[in-house]
Amino acid sequence: MKILSLLKVALVGSACGLSVLSAAKTEQPNILFIFADDLSYETIRAHGHLDIDTPNLDRLAAEGTTFSHAYNMGSWTGAVCMASRSMINTGQFVWRTPRTGGDFKPVVAARETWSQLLKSAGYRTYMTGKWHVSMDAAKIFDVAVDIRPGMPKDVKEGYNRPVDEAAYEAGWKPWETKYGGFWQGGTHWSEVIANHAEGFLAEAAEDDAPFFMYLAFNAAHD
């Protein structure tokens, strides 16, 4: 049985239980899913990291939902995040989740991706940022803006780590805009994505339909 089916059963069961407690609570919640790339849970203070303060992330953890038992059991590619994204969007384990564009076709045709299921439930769906899945985001989300397949175009300056302080002073810096990379028109890619998200939130505020936003940053990936 697919995980999606199990989730459906769990959600239905939860809904039945809640209806007994409060029949009035039938409103569908808005869903903002924030995807941080290669960010370990151990780097967030709310999850036990005490060396660095992360007040905004802590507030999100306190006011939202964190999945502390979610686990990626492996990958079929060197880019582990690619398998992770496939599993998240299809609800399938790593040994069953699609890998290539052709593998995704039956899943999309059956409208079994996460966003498609939510669209069927009446949600307006939105995606921006790093996708890295062999599906066309524009076909499974209502709105798909500035979709990146993976990382920015690589340049040797970005991967030649300085061997000493002198080499660092003379070399390229990650915040320099001349090679493009994480910069778009002088604005860092994280800010570009966040600006898109703010724009959609303002638009969604005028819409009665619930929304699902898939907000995928490249950060904190190096």
Segments (PLM) and residue ranges:
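Formylglycine-dependent sulfatase
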Residues: 2-7, 14-222
